[in-house]
């Protein structure tokens, strides 16, 4: 008897992380290699400069088949773009796209089969390189805007955009914004991240963050913390008084950010 399993998830339960920064300079020799999407969605749509490239689904028979949500490999970076912009027919376009994707995956190396296809399509190496520079890209070539959409029940519910950094923002997250001071002091962990205009972590940002507090609060540790891998952290502790408090964070190259906390007072119980 066939069983029907109901999906009780909501759009807020869907996650999406992309393994690659899509920046050639982040990879050896400028060759990006494999790109994976980690998501619990049904499929993934991939766009380049607002042009739809392809849609990918989890491989449930591959090497990650034992996982409830196998990562999705993004293996086609050309898709239908050759038909749209180069005028190639439906027979030739997929073959040329396969050659370009192989060049991306294998650092410009071509298998004997791909070389045979190249000659049968009457493509010169220079013509192939021009297509590679245009649709895949190398160090120094114009950067594209890549968009990844996690598709769940037929609609996009999560989006990740990878593009050159245009602005830097300091993100401050207080993991326990309501503290209770009583017989002992209470404490909150704070996470700091340097992110770009799309919310992507900037792992090469190593600026120092200056911290200051207002209200019944004190910083546990130094008031200046350096970012490592684009991230840092600190701890805040109560001082024995109640009231509103505020943490201010300042970093060169980004707007100041702040976080609000509430300190409550619980009198020590008498025996």
Task: Pin down the residues of each PLM region.
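The feature marks long extracellular or luminal low-complexity segments
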Residues: 6-36, 42-271
């Amino acid at each position: 008897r066939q069983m029907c399993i109901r999906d009780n998830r909501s759009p807020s339960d869907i996650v999406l992380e992309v393994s690659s920064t899509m920046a050639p300079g982040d990879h050896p020799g400028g060759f990006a290699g494999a790109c994976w999407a980690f998501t619990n969605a049904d499929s993934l749509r991939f766009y380049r400069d607002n042009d739809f490239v392809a849609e990918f689904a989890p491989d449930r028979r591959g090497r990650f088949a034992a996982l409830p949500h196998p990562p999705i490999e993004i293996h086609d970076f050309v898709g239908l773009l050759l038909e749209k912009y180069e005028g190639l027919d439906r027979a030739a376009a997929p073959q040329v796209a396969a050659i370009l994707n192989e060049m991306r995956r294998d650092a410009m190396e071509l298998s004997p089969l791909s070389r045979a296809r190249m000659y049968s399509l009457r493509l010169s190496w220079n013509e192939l390189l021009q297509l590679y520079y245009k649709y895949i890209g190398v160090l120094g070539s114009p950067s594209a805007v890549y968009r990844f959409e996690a598709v769940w029940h037929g609609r996009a519910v999560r989006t990740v955009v990878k593009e050159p950094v245009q602005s830097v923002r300091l993100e401050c997250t207080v993991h326990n914004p309501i503290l209770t001071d009583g017989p002992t002091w209470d404490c909150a962990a704070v996470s700091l991240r340097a992110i770009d205009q799309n919310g992507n972590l900037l792992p090469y940002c190593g600026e120092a963050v200056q911290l200051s507090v207002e209200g019944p609060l004190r910083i546990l540790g130094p008031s200046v913390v350096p970012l490592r891998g684009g991230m840092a952290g600190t701890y805040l502790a109560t001082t024995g008084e109640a009231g509103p408090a505020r943490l201010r964070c300042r970093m060169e190259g980004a707007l100041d950010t702040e976080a609000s906390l509430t300190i409550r007072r619980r009198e020590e119980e008498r025996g």
